């Protein structure tokens, strides 16, 4: 007997934010659809590479109810409770700095964590250039020079071009094999997180905690770091706007989050 879909996992950048009226905002169609979905007693879970603090911003700005799978699964908040938070330690951060050193100003990275300011490798680098609205008062060197209560759930790295990205990504994967997960959420970036962390792993653990089958979840995304999530359940959808090499790896395709929600509601009603 068919079971209804009860939870939707949605990527943010390039997915939920696709077509929004301003940077980091969603369309009114997506907002209304999420409200309809949760009003029907279902869950909407943000599945993103971003820190978990984005959840509160979305709930306030768009009047939606949601949980979050943050930093590619390194931190999960469900029903306002932190289920887990896995951090990259200072020793590993130092190793990353050393591997980036030969690239000079062609590579920059930030520590992804719920903090009021961004911690960056270099001032006035690529991260600051691309995210000028954020606050940049502390460098990575300054941050790891003294013991801290909080370390990042993920490292977000920006490269000058695709060639550098692919070369460095290969070096990082080889150096940290078994110690850090290396992935990407865009053509110019690299993301590093704790081993055994991934959107797919977090999705399966959340479904287990909610006593839901894999067939009772749907997911949507558009990038490399979404692929494991889209491929681990029957109803994984890739955004029509995604790059061809991403779309080729996911059998189901759809145009937007609100279209997926409509699809799920129709599926449940038939």
Where are these regions (language model features)?
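A short, Lys/Arg-enriched amphipathic alpha-helix followed by its capping loop at the start of a domain
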Residues: 2-8, 32-42, 175-176
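Mg2+-dependent phosphoryl-transfer enzymes with acidic/Ser/Thr/Gly-rich catalytic loops
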Residues: 3-7, 27, 191-270
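Asp-based phosphoryl-transfer active-site loop
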Residues: 4-22, 230
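Short, well-ordered alpha-helix to beta-strand connector turns
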Residues: 5, 41, 65, 152-153, ...
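Active-site phosphate-binding/coordination module
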Residues: 27-127
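Hydrophobic beta-strand scaffold residues
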Residues: 44, 107-109, 182, 236, ...
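Short hydrophobic/aromatic-enriched beta-strand-loop microsegments
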Residues: 65-72, 86, 129-132, 236-241, ...
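Conserved acidic, metal-coordinating active-site core of Asp-based
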Residues: 106-220, 228, 232, 241
């Amino acid at each position: 007997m068919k079971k209804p879909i009860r939870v939707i996992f949605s990527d943010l950048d390039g997915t939920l934010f696709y077509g929004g009226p301003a940077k980091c905002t969603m369309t009114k169609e997506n907002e209304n659809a999420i409200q309809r979905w949760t009003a029907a007693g279902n869950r909407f879970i943000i599945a993103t590479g971003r820190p978990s603090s984005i959840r509160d911003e979305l709930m306030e700005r768009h009047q939606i109810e949601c949980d979050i799978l943050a930093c590619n699964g390194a931190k999960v908040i469900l029903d306002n409770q932190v289920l887990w938070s896995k951090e990259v330690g200072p020793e590993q951060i130092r190793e990353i700095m050393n591997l980036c050193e030969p690239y000079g100003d062609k590579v920059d990275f930030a520590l992804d964590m719920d903090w009021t300011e961004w911690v960056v490798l270099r001032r006035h680098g690529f991260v600051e250039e691309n995210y000028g609205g954020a606050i940049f008062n502390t460098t990575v060197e300054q941050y790891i020079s003294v013991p801290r209560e909080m370390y990042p759930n993920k490292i977000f790295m920006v490269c000058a071009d695709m060639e550098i990205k692919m070369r460095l990504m290969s070096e990082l994967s080889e150096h940290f094999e078994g110690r850090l997960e290396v992935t990407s959420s865009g053509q110019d970036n690299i993301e590093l997180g704790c081993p055994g962390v991934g959107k797919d792993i977090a999705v399966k653990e959340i479904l287990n905690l909610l006593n839901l089958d894999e067939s009772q979840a749907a997911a949507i995304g558009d990038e490399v770091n979404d692929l494991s999530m889209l491929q681990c359940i029957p109803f994984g959808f890739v955004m029509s706007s995604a790059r061809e090499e991403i779309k080729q790896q996911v059998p189901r395709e759809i145009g937007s989050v609100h279209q997926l929600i409509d699809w799920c509601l129709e599926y449940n009603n038939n």
